[in-house]
Amino acid sequence: MDFLTNLRFTEGISEPYIEIFEQPRQRGTRFRYKCEGRSAGSIPGEHSTDNNKTFPSIQILNYFGKVKIRTTLVTKNEPYKPHPHDLVGKGCRDGYYEAEFGPERQVLSFQNLGIQCVKKKDLKESISLRISKKINPFNVPEEQLHNIDEYDLNVVRLCFQAFLPDEHGNYTLALPPLISNPIYDNRAPNTAELRICRVNKNCGSVKGGDEIFLLCDKVQKDDIEVRFVLGNWEAKGSFSQADVHRQVAIVFRTPPFLGDITEPITVKMQLRRPSDQAVSEPVDFRYLPDEEDPSGNKAKRQRSTLAWQKPIQDCGSAVTERPKAAPIPTVNPEGKLKKEPNMFSPTLMLPGLGTLSSSQMYPACSQMPTQPAQLGPGKQDTLHSCWQQLYSPSPSASSLLSLHSHSSFTAEVPQPGAQGSSSLPAYNPLNWPDEKNSSFYRNFGNTHGMGAALVSAAGMQSVSSSSIVQGTHQASATTASIMTMPRTPGEVPFLRQQVGYRS
């Protein structure tokens, strides 16, 4: 078969060439050591996603037929020397990939290519292997290949070579090699993909100066910056190398915005590596207008006011009206004081004597400022018959008082009828505690008070004490006690204290 019959040239184009259909992803691929004992994985394509995985691929233009493809690793910078790292995967041997493809495949994809890195002590051995296998796409002099210090072990490129068959069917016609974009080791901080993992806040003052804590993948503290971008405006966050913590955290302060704003403005915040101008995926950052109350005290007061107003509104508008004070009713003083019966009213009324004015008996009583209260309802017992015989209306009040000034006793005073009346109620004998006391008072009355001398002192004390004890258990309007009639007007207050007088 003639060699020219295997070539299908397009009109106007004399030679076939290689074109990269999809570039490999530059960042995100991890170079693995052989000692890790696991697959190096596959190099993803630049358009690969989690749901739709793609891989690096090429196509041969201006040619239709069989072709042999060789893929190797070369250095990032010119001259492109064979790299000491190895390509591993299906179809790989001695650190490179080689396979034949028929005319039915227009696009050639490489799905199982991984990168395996070598140790520094094995670099010379790896380069010697490349030379022995004639893996030198750009024919770099051998002397330059042994310069180990010039190799960057954190970045490689894919080199695609295509060999077409000659008239004997041997793949001896080589097309010009083509290199891909650089592929960076994801473990190396100076070449790894930049990525913002998390920030503690995504907004700040338009004046800048807000402290931001940013978590990221590994970065070089002397080769990283935080950039804020909006259109043609660009600013950088302020931080030093000491603010980069273990290559995975950056503490910086935001730059001020271009000018004053009246509403929030959203800008883009991203990491950038100055050495290769690599940038991360941006995140949103909002600049807020300058607040007159940065501490938020005004907002707190408003929230507190609203918290009180809501329950009041729920209860109704009537609650908010202040109730009017009701007038204080006039209370009769008699309603607040407990009235006790007074044994000595302004007009003293004694049975059998008629009505005696207190001013006649005790002239000093008329000067008392407080008038005694009237007797309340209660049990009213009349005097014994001896008192009716002793105190007739004929004797004067003065002779009666002089006669019984030293030996007398008090009984319960009946409620007087009309003012100035001398009539006595119906006779009702006293309820004496026992027969002994009853006979004593009866004898006392028959002798006109002189019978008291015939009674012993012990008997008098027993009679008096029993009368007092019995009297305390009667109704509140009664008063039973043994007392001495006052001899002088000055003894009236003492008498009132003895009978329980209350103003």
Swiss-Prot record:
UniProt-recorded name of the protein:
Transforming protein rel polyprotein
The gene for this chain is V-REL
Predominant location: host cell
According to the entry, every stretch annotated as the RHD domain falls at 16-305
Looking up InterPro entries in the UniProt record yields: Ig-like_fold, Ig_E-set, IPT_dom, IPT_NFkappaB, NFkB/Dor, p53-like_TF_DNA-bd_sf, RHD-n_c-Rel, RHD_CS
The superkingdom listed in its UniProt entry is: Viruses
Q: PANTHER family annotated for this entry?
A: NUCLEAR FACTOR NF-KAPPA-B PROTEIN, PROTO-ONCOGENE C-REL
- Which Pfam families does the annotation name? RHD_dimer, RHD_DNA_bind
Lineage of this protein's species?
A: Viruses, Riboviria, Pararnavirae, Artverviricota, Revtraviricetes
Record flagged with keyword Phosphoprotein: yes
- What's its job? This transforming protein appears to have a protein-kinase activity.
What molecular functions are annotated in GO for this chain? Answer: DNA-binding transcription factor activity, RNA polymerase II-specific; RNA polymerase II cis-regulatory region sequence-specific DNA binding
What are the UniProt keywords, alphabetically?
Answer: Host cytoplasm, Oncogene, Phosphoprotein
